[in-house]
From Swiss-Prot:
Pathway participation: Cofactor biosynthesis; thiamine diphosphate biosynthesis
Species classification: Bacteria, Pseudomonadati, Pseudomonadota, Gammaproteobacteria, Enterobacterales
Intrachain S-S bonds: none
GO CC terms: cytoplasm
Organism in which the protein naturally occurs: Yersinia pseudotuberculosis serotype O:1b (strain IP 31758)
Annotated protein name in UniProt: Thiazole synthase
Binding-site list for 1-deoxy-D-xylulose 5-phosphate: G156, A182, G183, N204, T205
Catalytic residue positions: K95 (schiff-base intermediate with dxp)
Protein's GO biological process: thiamine diphosphate biosynthetic process
CDD domains named in the record: ThiG
């Protein structure tokens, strides 16, 4: 079981709604995935229509909808989108996305942290999409985010866990769920993330653009379940299993430690 804020999920596969060829195919694939948390971009929803082509089918699934602020380029724009989503969809959950660079869609760390602080104070359950930066993820946790969503590689790239070493540090130090988001292009990538210790993954492009999105959604479902079972079973020691502390050294060692230097300064202060 995975708990985020006040909600418990039995599925660790979260899914998106973009790039599907039709709402009907999207709905069928999402059902096959078993996902219980589905994200949707507010910019793609017609809030004036009670029968929106995206929103109406999603409501049939009986899952938690996670509106995202994709398209926002500043903290102010993201905060506005989150407030709009809360009013229109009656939810205080939001996936915080701020990426001003339209070429690579990399998240803006400064604006993301600014927006997260405001939204948390306003009572939102904030799940921020962010770079695989252990320091930033810790700061987002400290301001009250319910989870962190570091990228595996750029959105839609299908490159997998190119940030693996940093993801490991984030997972090791995080006290909130870690959801690997972006770049997961194959079920094997999702399995790897769960084996690494991630609490969940979010997948969109790899499912939506597959030759058979329904079959691919089911494949991701099985991969995530397998990855979680393998982690719980206890993976044996190997260079590919960083959960075993003796197999991989990630902690930094300074080439010029300041310990002695700082001690001398302290002694001089007391003289």
């Amino acid at each position: 079981m995975l708990k985020i804020a006040d909600t418990t999920f039995t599925s660790r596969l979260f899914t998106g709604t973009g790039k599907f060829s039709s709402p009907e195919l999207m709905l069928e694939a999402l059902r096959a995935s078993g996902s219980q948390l589905i994200t949707m971009a507010m910019k793609r929803v017609d809030l004036q229509s009670g029968n929106d082509a995206i929103l109406a089918p999603l409501r049939q699934l009986g899952v938690r909808l996670l509106p995202n602020t994709s398209g926002a380029k500043t903290a102010e724009e993201a905060i506005f989108a989150a407030r709009l989503a809360r009013e229109a969809l009656n939810t205080h959950w939001v996936k915080l996305e701020i990426h001003p660079d339209v070429r690579y869609l990399l998240p803006d760390p400064i604006e993301t942290l600014k927006a997260a602080e405001v939204l948390v104070k306003e009572g939102f359950v904030v799940l921020p999409y962010c770079g695989a930066d252990p320091v930033l993820c810790k700061r987002l946790e400290e301001v009250g985010c319910a989870a962190v969503m570091p990228l595996g590689s750029p959105i839609g790239s299908n490159l997998g866990l190119r940030t693996r070493d940093f993801l490991q540090i984030i997972i090791e130090q995080s006290k909130v769920p870690v959801v690997v988001d972006a770049g997961i292009g194959a079920p094997s990538h999702a399995l790897e993330a769960l084996e690494l210790g991630a609490d969940a993954v979010l997948v969109n492009t790899a499912i939506a653009v597959a030759h058979s999105p329904v079959q691919m959604a089911h494949a991701f479902r099985l991969a995530v379940e397998s990855g979680e079972r393998a982690r719980l079973a206890g993976l044996g020691a190997s260079p590919f299993n960083p959960s075993q502390p003796d197999t991989l050294q990630l902690r930094a060692t300074a080439t010029s430690p300041l310990t002695g230097f700082l001690s001398q300064l302290e002694e001089q202060d007391h003289v």
